[in-house]
Curated annotation (Swiss-Prot):
Record's GO cellular component terms: cytosol
Listed EC numbers: 2.1.3.2
InterPro entries, alphabetized: Asp/Orn_carbamoyltranf_P-bd, Asp/Orn_carbamoylTrfase, Asp/Orn_carbamoylTrfase_sf, Asp_carbamoyltransf, Asp_carbamoyltransf_Asp/Orn-bd
Family of this protein: Belongs to the aspartate/ornithine carbamoyltransferase superfamily. ATCase family.
Protein name in the entry: Aspartate carbamoyltransferase catalytic subunit
Amino acid sequence: MTELRRHAIDLDNFSATEIEEILETAESMREVLSREIKQVPALRGKTVVNMFFEESTRTRISFELAARALSANVVAFTARGSSVEKGESLVDTVRTLQALGADIIVMRHSQSGAPYLVARHFRGSLINAGDGRHAHPTQALLDLYTMQSRLGQIRDLHVVIVGDILHSRVVRSNLWGLTRLGARVTLCGPPTLIGPAAFWTATWPQVRIAYELDPLLPEADVVMALRLQKERMQSGLLPALREYTRIYGLTSERLARLPSHAIVMHPGPMNEGIEIFPEVATASPAVIEEQVTNGVAVRMALLYRMAG
């Protein structure tokens, strides 16, 4: 493997074929998880360190379950109580973990680009579990897997992503994956939460930008709502939550305009009653709980790949 190929920092470094191979492996891993004994010895003897510098529920637990299902030794690292609180640098922490025998590090960090720094100083494999606004590749992979398992393919799907586009690491990773696999993507939201269109089209020229959701719904195969980060209200990027919900909130009335085969997704955590309503989040066509379930199989597939 080349230096970057040893790591999964974002999907920009994965070809369409490689992404498809991960999704295919995830299908096999889902079969493992359906058994009475949900474990295979694929990573026996390997040590996976989950190093989370940000709070997480779904991603952290999903990675722990995935690694254990592959029979890996799993170590949960938290910054609280560690030498990081005493001033140890991120690089020194990683070198310590390497000296202790870590084979794979799964890292979440608040600073965009932190995984690139770690990757330069770690001889094993690094999986990015989310860094700042930059990337969340395993969320994108599980989203792709969910779309494919529900709709049969990714190519030519029209995927509408609505919400706080500008500040979302999920969007960026999904754009790499969706465009590589031939989907059509529309980013939708208030202009202040999308930013300049050229910011997106310079990297993904095939992506469309829209500021109204309703006209997109009759032709959408997938609608993915993003969490509205309430702190944006304080910075003046939104006039009022009620106004946002009126124009962009996923209500049962609004989703009645979708084609019968369409699905609704959300990477979580959700602000119910703001970007999505409870009756929508827990009933068809929503597949939000399915996304969470699929995350274990997808992360098993990626860990298996990273272990060589």
